[in-house]
Amino acid sequence: RKSGGGCVYADMTNIMFSYITPDENVSLTFSKYINMVSEMLRKLGIPAETSGRNDIMIDGRKVSGNAFYHIPGRSIVHGTMLYDTNIENMVGAITPSCEKLVSKGIQSVRQHITLLKDHISLDIEEFTAFTRRNLCNGEIVLYDDAIAQIAHIEEEYLTPEFIYGNNP
């Protein structure tokens, strides 16, 4: 991903989101949007808290990782929320170094994460609808030129070089 940082695992039950804003102050912008996500989770009775610079935690376990980058005139905050991710598949795909886990006092990836489905009674469709109602403030219509630009970006992201090893 353009924002750098760790690896992002994606499957059909890992909810991803992005905010694109003209705000340029990195720490204020990042904090604003990550806190919006945490507050939304708290509305559901989930004891979500931001941790460090880029994680959202539930009872000390990570449920959301987030990143930030800036391009001229825009800042982008994006993240993931683990709803019902297959932990075994994720662990097989993402293998942080033992040194990183030990430095954080973590025995394994499994010990460090939690899934939203274990904290709420909403199914993924209901949770996604709740997320849209609480975090989206409107609809944007994309025109042909924007769609063409998106298709060009998508081509880059679908190359094996990007998927398996291109780092910003």
Where are these regions (language model features)?
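A short beta-strand motif that forms the metal-chelation/ATP-contact edge
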Residues: I58-A67
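Short, surface-exposed recognition loops or helix-turn segments adjacent to catalytic cores
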Residues: I46-D59, L142-A148
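Broad gene-expression machinery/nucleic-acid interaction feature
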Residues: N14-M16, R53, K62, I76-T80
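Hydrophobic, helix-prone linear segments
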Residues: G6, K32, A48-T50
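Solvent-exposed alpha-helices and their adjacent loops that cap or buttress functional pockets
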Residues: R1, V8-A10, E49, Y69-S75
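N-terminal lobe of the biotin/lipoate ligase/transferase fold
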Residues: R1-S27
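Long, well-ordered alpha-helical scaffolding segments within enzyme catalytic domains
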Residues: V26-K43
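Long, positively charged amphipathic alpha-helical accessory segments at protein N-termini or as interdomain linkers
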Residues: V37, L44, S64, P72-N166
